[in-house]
Every structure is written in structure tokens, then in C-alpha cells.
Amino acid sequence: MTFWDIILYTVSYFGLFTAVFFLLTLIENRNQIKNPRPPQKLPKVTVMVPACNEQDCLAKTVESLLSLDYPKELLQIIVIDDGSTDKTLRIARGFEKDGVLVLTKPNGGKGTALNLGLKHATGEFVVCLDADSVVEPDALKKMLGYFRRKAVMAVTPSLKCTEPKTIWQRIQVIEFLLGVYLRKVFAYLGSIHVTPGPFTVFRKELFDKHGGYDTTTCTEDIEISLRIQSLGYEIENAVDANVYAVAMPTFNTTRKQRVRWYKGFLENTQKYKHLLFSRKYGNLGLFVLPSAYLSVILATVMVSYSLYVMADKNYQRFMNLYNVNFDIWRLLEFKWDIFYLDQSPLMIIGLAALAIGIAMIVLAKRMSREKQSLTLNYVLFMFLYLPLYTFWWLNAIHARIKNKDVGWRGRKRKEAEIKYA
């Protein structure tokens, strides 16, 4: 057995073990998937919408909040304009007649906008909704029932993509659905480590007791979730409380977003490094966070090996053709036989992993009541995601080492994004 064989078996075993473990966790807890009933006496909820140069998306976002199936007298909506240079503030003020509170401030980043919103929040619970996202009318009620347990400080929704139109958006549809699946599994394991910006619900007392959003990180949603975990509180998930965000439509915008997410993960896991390998924090510290790091290493090794094998085989094919003066007609005489099929253990493991991957997507689709067709999206994801994932992580590691600013402060949407907003 060669060195590369050992690496491949290690990668394959880790991937298959993790996938089976997560699947069994979901099956074991299948009777708990249904959301608890919301309280009979509904609490007051504040929804904060931080917005910077979101003139093309903001109106739909606020309209979705005004359409929530929730008593209007118990719903406070705050739009915080973070120094926009377009028509965002004007659009926001157009909703003041509907009772929306509009605040404005110089540009300082999402965390500073949310902290301003917290100062004006009057609800027992607070929600952040990104200005490029829309929420289904029944989402809020589906989430509130989890707060019957005092230990629960946050409840996450199912974050999904709007209708995809580009290759990159189709890949993200599957990526987001995997996130839906994993977030529910992580909830059962007590290991949710990202509270998505679109429509995570928090107890306001969390911020009153332990401070507001961290304004020094590019991913405040990761920081606040790790802070909650480190304080010994819990984060739950309502798998069919659907929120839809506009997926990045181009290669470059997708890359920038993922680099920001991954760099933020590196920053915040370093900040909360006491969580890693700690028995005190259970599955999160002993398995989920270490596995996240290990998956990056193994993915990089796998992609590197695949590129090496591909280059080597293509070189061998070229030399074979060169030696027969590029006489390709003989290739047409090839007769296929079933014995040419690869029957190695690696192939069997690979097929098993593929089957489990499909099962994960199907389960996520059913649990979150997703209706769009996924076949083409999954094919694109299967062939393109792993090299893209590795590329994004290498970019993020480089940005972390160089301490590059990857935030989107004051950013304006490109024309390609506006087209799909």
C-alpha cells in the first residue's frame, strides 16, 4: 500500500464515518423534528434589518416582515441604514407609514448597525434579518416554541436560496440545503456554531447581560454563536422555518463571500479556542469543531491528489498517442466489458458516500418543505464543489495570515448581482 493509498483511505473513512454518524443522529431524533407549539401568550419581538446600499432588495425584505403571521402590536421592525450612498434610506423611510422605525448612522459595518438597533429594541426577543433576504409568513411562530426551555438563547431558521439562475447559484442551492440538514443535526448534538444573519431569533437578555455584537469580526453570526456556547447556553433549530437569501450569482462574488465566512470562522475559533478539544463543551469541542478543521485539510489533500492523478494520466495518454503517431482509430475498436469496472474498496466507499449524500439532500428537502427541482443542481455540486471549497479555504487562510480586510463595509452590489436580486 502506497502513501497515497493511506491518505485516500483516511479521507474516505473520515468522510463516510462522519456522514453515517450525522445520518444516525437525525434518525435517532426523528420524533423531535416537529417544532414545539408557540406560547399561547405571544411575546413582543423586534426584527432588525441592517442595510448598506441595498436599494434593490430592501423593499422585498421589509414587505416580507410586514406579511408575517404575527400580531402587529407585538412586532417591532427596525431598519438601520449604515451610511448607504444609494436610495436605501429613502426606500426605508417609505415604510415609516407602516410603523417601521428607521435609524441611520455613518457607515461602520453590520455589527455597529445591529448594536444601534439593540438600543432601540423593545421586544423580549430580537431578530436580525439581512436586507437581501425574505422570510415566510409562518417562520417566526415556528421558532418561538423552542424558548420554553430557559437554557435556549437562540433559534436558527432554515436558510435557503431563492430561485437559481446561474451555475454558481445552483451549486449554492445544494450547499445551503446541506446547511439545513447539518444545522438540525448540530442542534441535536448541541453543536450549532453559526447563527445565520437571516432571521435567527435571540433572547434580548443575552445582549443585555453579555454585551452586543462584536464589531471587530467580519462574521458576527459565528462570534455570537460561539459566545452562546461558551457561556453554557443552547442554540436550537426550526428546520421548516424558511428564510430565502439571494445567492451570489458570479464566481467572484461567491468567492468573496465564502472567503469572508471562512476567515471569520478562523478568527472566532481562535478567539474561543478554549472550546476546542474540551470535554466541557461535549460534541462541539470534541468532534464538530475539530472535524471542521480536519475536513479542510483532507479536502485539500484530496483535491491535490486528484489533480496530480489527472495530470499524470493525461500525460500517459498523450505519450501513448504520440508513440502510435496519434492513430486514434484503434481506440474505436475498444470493446467494453463488465470486468473493467473498478471494484476496489475505495470505489465501494465512494458509492456509499454518494448514496448518503443524496439521502442527506432528500431529507433536507423534505424537512424544510423545499419544492424546486434539485437534479441539475446536485450534479453541478458533486463535480465542482470540492475543488471550489478547497480554493475558497486556501484564499481564506491566506487572508487570515495576511490579516486582509474581507468585510463588505460600504459595499455596493455589482450589476450582475442586481440582475438576480
Feature locations, PLM:
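A conserved acidic beta->alpha catalytic loop
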Residues: 81-89
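Juxtamembrane C-terminal module of membrane proteins
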Residues: 24-43, 275-286, 316-421
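N-proximal low-complexity "stem/linker" segments adjacent to membrane-targeting elements
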Residues: 1-63
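Cell-envelope/extracellular polymer assembly enzymes that use nucleotide-activated donors
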Residues: 43-46, 76, 223
